[in-house]
């Protein structure tokens, strides 16, 4: 999911957790005697294909950057699997997006000593066309304004520009909390606070971003990767650019307070699942112990420990994108980026060699994968599984959102075996370009008004590998009673309040904010019953969300089996429900901007550029 949208989504979930009506009812006698429900449960838990499917998708095919060759190969594979199971499926093109092929990345320090550096290209970066580029690395200065920046640009010609701050320690916050003296921690606090202030987006007198200054006074944005600043530097003739977005610093992860640690105030220590904060870190790293679950009111603003940077995961970097077409853009791990930065800072003239294999492929077809099991009694009413199929490609796209994809695929396989003649049509949507702004799902809703009209329920999952522990929705008067009745179909495995597998449901009459930053939010524009599936964390935001460590080994297969089985059971219950969910909105004062994800979907890269 996208960073800003993810922040909005988790803010809503946090508020729902406080305000919503939550119940955990004992399983009904009907659940224990329903032969189809029991068959679904046994197939899902005893003969899961999740490990086999996951290994093929994550290891063999790999990450699914929108419109890349791997994205197309993955779409062909999913379609093939569905057809082998007797499920109708197709790749449904809705537009184009810029295509890109990732090859090898070799990044080396050549002077003042030789060292291979740990890093890779940003997505959509140009390569070096078979001719390695060696150039001096220089730090992007801080400018008074964009005029001063333009005057400086000739000095950057032929150089590799360092675009990020050098984080003063690459150790995790836990080390500092456990081993550091009070004096040492205080000094590190001050150093980090100064770094954040020095590299933060520049603001005007009202505290809003100053459009004439923005990042380092350049007047350009760094965005998720190199942004418009990268294209301006490219125009000036730089040889390349290097950034580093580690998970240690509030600065490098300014919106992660939604999942970061601590209770806020002066920082939050190691932090559990923090609140809805989003400012650059300015506080202390001495917050006490694991942070409690938070809301917008107590969100962490800490510097190192519990602030917006989260729990301080190390050994990971976030890998996003570049809009360059000539100058390559790479990202380095914290340790190696800091090495190059210190050499440049101390005027020791680091020379870096980039040898990068990549192909910019121009606009390529992009698509959603749509599958269905046709309904026998009400074929024009639909129950839908939803998960985005695309990913960033620094890792394997395993937990974001390969596990959501696997949940949906495995649930469809189970349903075809245990419930082959559903009352309503069962659909699955594997969306493209979620990471670029929910583009694939938005296009589907625009192209399929008949599905929007007949949608009984949509179940969306996009929050990592953990087992689903909550089902939640809001806005429509009729959703609550239906969720309650569907809950009654679940075997005791999911309803025993003493079990770690227990699943609760919640309903909030009036939405408390924007419906969030994943594809389920798009369906709220059409007042459809969109149900979110909330999962346990497994340090998702800290270690695998958008990082180089989002790989097969991070998947918790038992939790994935749990999720696929639960999804299949809920789809079965929604399909069998004798009544259709009303579109009547709940009374009350709704947020003025709700929902905020509506609009015309981009059908090509051009609007983004």
Go through each PLM region and give its residues.
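N-terminal hydrophobic or amphipathic helices/low-complexity stretches enriched
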Residues: 29-71, 80, 373-377, 584, ...
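Soluble metallo-hydrolase cores and metallopeptidase-like ectodomains found primarily
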Residues: 34-36, 125-150, 288-398, 410-413, ...
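Short helix-loop-beta-strand segments that form the rim/entrance of peptidase-like active sites
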Residues: 52, 414-439, 458
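Disordered, low-complexity segments in secreted/periplasmic proteins that are enriched in proline
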Residues: 208, 216, 248-315, 603-609
């Amino acid at each position: 999911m996208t960073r800003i949208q993810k922040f909005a989504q988790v803010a809503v979930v946090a508020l729902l957790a406080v305000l919503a009506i939550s119940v955990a009812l004992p399983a009904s006698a009907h659940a224990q005697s329903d032969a189809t429900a029991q068959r679904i449960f046994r197939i899902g838990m005893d003969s899961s294909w999740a490990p086999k499917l996951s290994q093929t998708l994550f290891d063999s095919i790999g990450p699914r950057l929108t419109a890349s060759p791997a994205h197309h190969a993955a779409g062909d594979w999913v379609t093939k699997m569905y057809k082998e199971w007797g499920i109708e499926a197709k790749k449904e093109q809705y537009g184009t997006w810029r295509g890109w092929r990732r090859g090898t990345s070799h990044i080396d320090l050549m002077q003042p000593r030789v060292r291979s550096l740990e890093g890779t290209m940003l997505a959509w970066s140009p390569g070096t066309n078979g001719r390695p580029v060696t150039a001096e690395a220089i730090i992007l200065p801080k400018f008074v304004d964009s005029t001063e920046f333009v005057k400086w640009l000739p000095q950057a010609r032929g150089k590799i520009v360092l675009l990020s701050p050098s984080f003063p320690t690459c150790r995790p916050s836990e080390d500092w909390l456990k081993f550091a003296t009070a004096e040492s921690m205080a000094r590190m606090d001050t150093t980090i606070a100064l770094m954040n202030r020095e590299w933060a987006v520049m603001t005007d007198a009202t505290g809003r971003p100053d459009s004439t200054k923005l990042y380092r006074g350049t007047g350009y944005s760094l965005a998720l990767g190199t942004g418009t600043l990268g294209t301006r530097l490219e125009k000036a003739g730089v040889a390349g650019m290097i950034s580093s977005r580690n998970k240690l610093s509030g600065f490098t992860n300014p919106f992660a307070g939604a999942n970061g640690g601590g209770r806020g105030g002066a920082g939050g220590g190691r932090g559990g699942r923090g609140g809805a904060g989003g400012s650059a870190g300015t506080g202390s790293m001495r917050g006490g112990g694991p942070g409690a679950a938070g809301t917008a009111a107590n969100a962490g603003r800490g510097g190192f420990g519990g602030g917006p940077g989260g729990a301080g995961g190390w050994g990971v970097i976030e890998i996003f994108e570049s809009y360059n077409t000539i100058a390559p853009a790479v990202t380095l791990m914290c340790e190696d980026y800091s090495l190059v930065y210190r050499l440049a800072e101390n005027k020791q003239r680091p020379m870096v060699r980039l040898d990068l294999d990549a192909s910019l492929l121009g606009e390529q077809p992009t698509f959603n994968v749509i599958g269905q099991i046709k309904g026998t009694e009400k074929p024009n009413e639909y129950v839908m599984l939803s998960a985005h199929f695309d990913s960033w490609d620094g890792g394997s796209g395993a937990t974001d959102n390969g596990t959501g994809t696997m949940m949906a695929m495995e649930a469809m396989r189970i349903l075809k075996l245990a419930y082959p003649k559903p009352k309503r049509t069962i659909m699955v949507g594997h969306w493209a370009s979620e990471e670029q702004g929910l583009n694939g799902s938005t296009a589907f809703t625009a192209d399929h008004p008949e599905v929007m009209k007949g949608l009984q329920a949509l179940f969306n999952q996009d929050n990592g590998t953990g087992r689903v522990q909550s089902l939640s929705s809001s806005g429509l008067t009729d959703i609550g009673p239906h969720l309650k009745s569907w809950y009654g179909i679940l075997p005791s495995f999911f309803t025993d309040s003493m079990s770690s597998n227990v699943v609760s449901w919640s309903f909030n009459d009036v939405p408390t904010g924007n419906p969030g930053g994943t594809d389920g939010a798009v369906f709220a524009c059409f007042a459809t019953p969109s149900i979110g599936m909330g999962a346990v964390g497994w340090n998702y935001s800290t270690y695998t969300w958008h990082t180089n460590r989002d790989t097969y080994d991070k998947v918790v297969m038992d939790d994935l089996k749990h999720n696929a089985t639960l999804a299949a059971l809920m789809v079965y219950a929604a399909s069998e429900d004798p009544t259709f969910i009303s579109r009547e909105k709940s009374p009350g004062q709704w947020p003025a901007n709700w929902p905020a994800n509506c609009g015309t979907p981009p059908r090509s890269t051009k609007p983004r550029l």
